[in-house]
């Protein structure tokens, strides 16, 4: 394993000399070759060298990063503007840990269109995860109610697929009959034509309603000229629907031709709330919200990072000719050049002083301050809950990392466990873990929650048992864990472990921890479901507490999240087993071919709907086997084929 460059002065100096003085991007990696940070500069060598001159001028976050740098790479570009575009793409595609400014704030929803699919789906989601580079997220939207109403009306105005999967294997459903769906499930509409419909829908969520009206008006006139009055009437209905869609956009500007985005930020020492108002043709068509880590960052830099991240993920037509910002950006001219290049037309980035534009900034800033106030209130509640939990469990300091565990199964079958983690009172989903119960004594028809929970504790903490056996100071490990939890996640020692269950589950867990010699090092409790009672090891009675206490509420949220996560995983395992067992009934399909089929088609529904030719294209499936699989799911087709062959023989 490589050592950090800071520990190798000669190698560091040589590496810095190798970096050119031209514009470009630099990439910093750690000992495991993980990308820590991507940056850009007009002069690469000077910029990279600045990280290693003096740590006093660096923020705590960047100082932590510099201590981990083991390798530095660079990519030379022709200009600083080109470096900015490259940096934006690298950050978007690789998400380096120390570049991620915007928080994954689940309260803001997005609209997703899966352009990568032959018949794209359109849905609301709070998880911004790209399954394909072609898929697009629109948002994040502040008002989820308005977003739902808009999507509901869009599905009334335009014929769109209404279901993620077909309702019937070989015929359309009622939605097709009443004109709500173009018959996607039976391919009544071509993929190209359906994409054309979706492109019109996307214009609504891009704030291009006026442009869409012009397009539809032209189509309606063409249909009328051809005397195709039925199609013209359908377009007329769509135009009326678009008028209804934009009825909620009441805020407007005096100049109806103006299109601009307006950004403002409100921040404290640790957190920033950013608002982006989208004005198109003089109307407010979208309000997007972002949350950011504001530690040691100037407001102008936060706004610049938001602009870089947001506009790197939108289509060129969504970039307006004017972007107003509350504060001067560190590289405002460069950002304007980059946006102009993206849009292929001039874009101005302005820090306005005159009244009308400054009033717009003030309006957006007030909304940002409101969001910051809500975030502070939430943080205060979380801090109070942690303090109350510390008092309940008699801890010296409020816990930062707490872990919750639960078991899920049906009479021992498909037994699984969940580990969920809250950090500073909030779910930290990157630290969640799922376990399949491995004990041979827990199987269908025989369950043992105590044994299952003990197994999970052994698997979770056996590495820490080895650390302790090697003579490590676990008190020091705890301190390191608390100081770096939110920075790099390197340490995963919990301040509190909570078990879903009563005294029995807690006793089994403590016995397992005693085997690991960690029973005195971990703070463990259990939360029983019926009376929300909290049990501690060795205590005969539950803790005295009130159900509405903040600390109890925190444990209850942790317990409910562990239960949800365990049940979801159990259902997945059970569903996969049932799929495998159903396919295993088909002659010629062994376990490997079943796995290959499911990997190729993704679901048993897709296998059931596949034609013989499509099945034949799957790995390891010959023509004869493809016919057998098709016949298994559609025996009536086989009967019809046999009857046809019999008729030919008689003839």
Swiss-Prot record:
The gene is uvrC. HAMAP family: UvrC (MF_00203). SUPFAM superfamilies: C-terminal UvrC-binding domain of UvrB, GIY-YIG endonuclease, RuvA domain 2-like. Belongs to the UvrC family. It comes from the Bacteria. One of its GO terms (cellular component) is cytoplasm. InterPro entries: GIY-YIG_endonuc (IPR000305), GIY-YIG_endonuc_sf (IPR035901), GIY-YIG_UvrC_Cho (IPR047296), Hlx-hairpin-Hlx_DNA-bd_motif (IPR003583), RuvA_2-like (IPR010994), UVR_dom (IPR001943), UVR_dom_sf (IPR036876), UvrABC_protein_C (IPR050066). The lineage of its organism: Bacteria, Bacillati, Cyanobacteriota, Cyanophyceae, Synechococcales. Its main location: cytoplasm. It comes from Synechococcus sp. (strain CC9311). It is found in: Cytoplasm. Gene3D superfamilies: 5' to 3' exonuclease, C-terminal subdomain (1.10.150.20), GIY-YIG endonuclease (3.40.1440.10), UVR domain (4.10.860.10), UvrC, RNAse H endonuclease domain (3.30.420.340). Residues 21-100 form the GIY-YIG domain. GO terms for biological process: nucleotide-excision repair; SOS response. Residues 210-245 form the UVR domain. This is UvrABC system protein C. GO terms for molecular function: DNA binding; excinuclease ABC activity. SMART domains: GIYc, HhH1.
């Amino acid at each position: 394993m490589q050592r950090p460059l800071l520990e190798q002065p000669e190698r560091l100096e040589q590496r810095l000399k190798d970096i050119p003085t031209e514009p470009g991007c630099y990439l910093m990696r750690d000992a495991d070759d993980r990308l820590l940070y991507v940056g850009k500069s007009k002069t690469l060598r000077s910029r990279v060298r600045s990280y290693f001159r003096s740590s006093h001028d660096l923020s705590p976050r960047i100082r932590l990063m510099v201590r981990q740098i083991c390798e530095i790479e660079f990519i030379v570009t022709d200009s600083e503007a080109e470096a900015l575009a490259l940096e934006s793409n690298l950050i978007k595609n690789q998400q380096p840990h120390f570049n991620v400014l915007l928080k994954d704030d689940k309260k803001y929803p997005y609209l997703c269109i899966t352009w990568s699919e032959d018949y794209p789906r359109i849905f609301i989601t709070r998880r911004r995860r790209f399954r394909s580079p072609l898929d697009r997220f629109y948002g994040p939207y502040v008002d989820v109610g308005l977003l739902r109403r808009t999507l509901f009306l869009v599905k009334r105005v335009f014929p769109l697929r209404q279901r993620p999967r077909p309702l019937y294997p070989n015929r359309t459903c009622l939605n097709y009959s009443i004109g709500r769906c173009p018959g996607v499930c039976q391919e009544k509409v071509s993929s190209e034509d359906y994409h054309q419909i979706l492109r019109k829908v996307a214009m609504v969520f891009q704030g291009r309603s006026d442009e869409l009206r012009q397009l539809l008006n032209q189509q309606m006139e063409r249909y009328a000229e051809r005397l195709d009055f039925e199609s013209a009437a359908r377009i007329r209905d769509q135009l009326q629907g678009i008028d209804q869609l934009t009825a909620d956009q009441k805020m407007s500007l005096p100049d109806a031709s103006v299109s601009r985005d307006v950004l403002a930020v409100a921040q404290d020492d640790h957190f920033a709330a950013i608002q982006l108002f989208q004005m198109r043709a003089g109307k407010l068509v979208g309000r997007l919200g972002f949350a950011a880590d504001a530690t040691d960052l100037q407001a102008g830099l936060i706004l610049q990072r938001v602009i870089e991240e947001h506009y790197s993920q939108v289509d060129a037509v969504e970039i307006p000719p004017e972007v107003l910002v509350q504060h001067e950006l560190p590289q405002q001219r460069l950002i304007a050049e980059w946006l102009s290049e993206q849009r292929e037309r001039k874009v101005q980035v302005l820090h306005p002083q005159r009244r009308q534009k400054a009033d717009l900034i003030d309006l957006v800033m007030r909304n940002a301050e409101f969001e910051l106030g809500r975030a502070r209130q939430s943080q205060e509640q979380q801090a109070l809950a942690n303090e109350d939990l510390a008092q309940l469990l008699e801890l010296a300091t409020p816990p930062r990392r707490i872990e919750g565990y639960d078991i899920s199964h049906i009479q021992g079958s498909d037994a699984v466990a969940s580990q969920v983690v809250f950090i500073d009172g909030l779910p930290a989903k990157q630290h969640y873990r799922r376990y399949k119960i491995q004990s041979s004594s827990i199987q269908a028809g025989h369950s043992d929650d105590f044994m299952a929970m003990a197994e999970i504790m052994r698997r979770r903490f056996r590495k820490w048992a080895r650390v302790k056996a090697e003579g490590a100071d676990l008190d020091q490990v705890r301190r390191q864990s608390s100081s770096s939890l939110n920075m790099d996640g390197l340490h995963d020692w919990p301040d509190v472990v909570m078990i879903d269950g009563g005294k029995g589950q807690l006793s089994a867990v403590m016995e397992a921890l005693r085997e690991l010699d960690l029973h005195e090092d971990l703070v463990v409790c259990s939360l029983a479901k019926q009376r929300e009672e909290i049990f501690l090891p060795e205590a005969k009675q539950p803790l005295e507490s009130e159900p509405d206490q903040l600390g109890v509420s925190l444990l209850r949220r942790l317990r409910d999240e562990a239960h949800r996560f365990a049940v979801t995983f159990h259902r997945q395992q059970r569903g996969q087993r049932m799929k495998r067992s159903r396919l295993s009934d088909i002659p010629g399909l062994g376990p490997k071919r079943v796995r290959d089929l499911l990997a190729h088609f993704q679901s048993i529904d897709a296998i059931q709907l596949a034609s013989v030719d499509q099945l034949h294209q799957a790995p390891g499936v010959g023509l004869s086997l493809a016919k057998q699989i098709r016949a298994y799911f559609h025996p009536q087709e086989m009967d019809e084929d046999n009857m046809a062959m019999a008729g030919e023989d008689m003839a």
